[in-house]
Amino acid sequence: MTSSVWQERRHGEDKQRRFDHRSPYQRDRARILHSAAFRRLQAKTQVLGVGMNDFYRTRLTHSLEVSQIGTGIAAQLRRKYPQHKQLLCSMSLLESLCLAHDIGHPPFGHGGEVALNYMMRDHGGFEGNGQTFRILSKLEPYTLDFGMNLCRRTMLGILKYPAPYSKLFVAGEHNEITNHRQLKPSQWPPVKGIFDDDNDIFAWVLEPLSEADRSRFTSTQEGSHPALHHYPHLRTQFKSFDCSIMELADDIAYAVHDLEDAIVMGIVTASQWHQDVAPTLTNSSDAWIKQELADIGNKLFSHEHHLRKDAIGTLVNGFVTAIVISEDDVFEEPLLRFNATLEPEFAIALNVLKQLVYKYVIRKPEIQMLEYKGQQIVMGLFEAFASDPERLLPLNTQVRWRESEQQGLNTHRILADYISGMTDEFAGRLYQQLFSPKAGSNVELSKEM
């Protein structure tokens, strides 16, 4: 592995700041942390809608927790595998990936994502991870045309689904929709991949790989996606070593910390835990899981906050310390050859917790109503802006739209960029501004975006 190749940036930088001793990955982390796109995560839905309660996680606090878990995983792997110290060369790199992993997700969570994907159905689709790649490499105004201009290895690590939309998309049968209110998310799952509009950047990221590695890394397969219950498209098969750590940290945070939110708010109960979780984990072949299960269950649903926090810490520690490094010797490049994976019994346990959150939290009618509302807001905004972009878009977005039109590029992508960058609250107020007769002046809104 030639580290200098992976530390390259698309746009060469000759900045020499006074007494700046930071590594390339420390600079990447700073750019992400100080970006407007990262700040907006504080007002974007994680699982529970923003404003429902002041306890639960937003996309921002979730990302901070993913970062902490990610560095914890790296520390454990460094201790277990000293022979792989070159792979685990930078905590700042992993922090960067974890902090940035949700930066492209639109307002209103999955509802907003499905809405944008539907509105972009004839224009290359929309998906949050693809938008993250686009923000980091093109949209965030740290540079004029190169986004945050991050290191190549950072960009490789953010690629959860390394294949373009056109390679993954499978046309499905859909009921004819005559009104946006009829849209069913199950019929319009976003393609998990990179937008074709960004293929040039994708090619640059993969440039150091051999032809064989590149071909295998971007290969696809049929089959349902593990994160989705209805997924007709092809799916990618591989991710880089750094990405595998980030994804595990994300899964642990989702399964454990979002479960904590649901327990505190009374959405998940002890009886549901004993019905859906305990039977599987009681039969686990792992001694630690069987030994800790009863104590964890009792503490999670205790009225003593410190006991619940102890159980949460025990769960996170259990998963983090059960992560190992696996090898796929078909790849030449070490960043692809090795991945972080969970031991099988802990992978089962993590999936059980994720299914618990999905069943009792995500599918809860009150949560689905909020998601549906967000879905309608996003589609309404998109339809309005698409009807007359040069009249309704903010001036700076109008400039981007006109440039895309003049160059024969995908102008609808500009609309998706603008709407996906909104917070839940801003999108809701803008919708009211456009469609409610009693809404006030647009002056205040224009100052925010």
Swiss-Prot record:
Q: Which CDD domains match?
A: HDc
Q: Name one GO biological process term.
A: dGTP catabolic process
Q: Which Gene3D superfamilies match?
A: Hypothetical protein af1432
Q: Check the record and name the SMART domains matching this protein.
A: HDc
The residues covered by the HD domain are: 59-255
The record ties this protein, via PROSITE patterns, to:
HD (PS51831)
Query: What family is this protein classified in?
Result: Belongs to the dGTPase family. Type 2 subfamily.
Q: What is this protein called?
A: Deoxyguanosinetriphosphate triphosphohydrolase-like protein
